[in-house]
């Protein structure tokens, strides 16, 4: 049996990345092995030089930071407050808060090694916001594509 365990990001400076993920994003340390650090929730960071050595060396396995091959996705129920905090930090934005076609508001920015981080508004918050703007549960379902029963359960509570 195969079991998924973690996503691993290669980083230049373990301490700088720990400060970012723990301090800004609130990640909780699971294991610190020096060259490899794992956080609760399935994210790990690995020191570039050590990782390249495991893979056969930098000539065989070059690392390209900022290549935009993917992103790490997080959610918050306080997107505006988190965005204001980001503006106080020394982060480079991919973009400020934008609304996706399905109604969710998100912000994207870079970690210290230019991995893309997305912080999205929790979908439950999207439903409540849209409902307060006059959308019916059916209209929210059409816009978001989420199951109607889920939307109705959120709006009832």
Roles of regions detected by a PLM:
Residues 1-10, 21:
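A broadly structural signal marking compact, well-ordered functional cores
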Residues 13-14, 77-80:
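Helix N-cap motif at beta-to-alpha junctions
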Residues 1-5, 27-74, 83-110, 122-133, ...:
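Vicinal oxygen chelate
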Residues 8-14, 101:
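Conserved beta-strand-loop-alpha-helix junction that forms the acyl-donor binding cleft
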Residues 17-22, 86, 114:
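Conserved active-site tyrosine of GNAT-family acetyltransferases
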Residues 150:
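Residues in the helix-turn-helix
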């Amino acid at each position: 049996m195969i079991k998924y365990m973690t996503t691993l990001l290669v980083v230049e400076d373990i301490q700088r990345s720990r400060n970012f993920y723990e301090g800004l994003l609130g990640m909780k340390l699971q294991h610190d092995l020096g060259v490899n650090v794992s956080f609760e929730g399935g994210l790990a960071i690995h020191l570039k030089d050590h990782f390249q050595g495991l893979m056969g060396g930098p000539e065989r396995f070059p690392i390209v930071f900022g290549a935009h091959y993917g992103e790490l996705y997080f959610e918050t129920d306080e997107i505006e407050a988190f965005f204001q905090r980001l503006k106080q930090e020394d982060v480079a934005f991919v973009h400020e808060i934008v609304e996706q076609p399905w109604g969710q508001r998100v912000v994207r920015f870079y970690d210290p090694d230019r991995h893309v981080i997305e912080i999205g508004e929790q979908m439950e918050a999207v439903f409540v916001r849209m409902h307060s703007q006059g959308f019916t549960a059916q209209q929210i379902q059409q816009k978001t594509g989420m199951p109607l029963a889920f939307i109705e359960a959120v709006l009832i509570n």
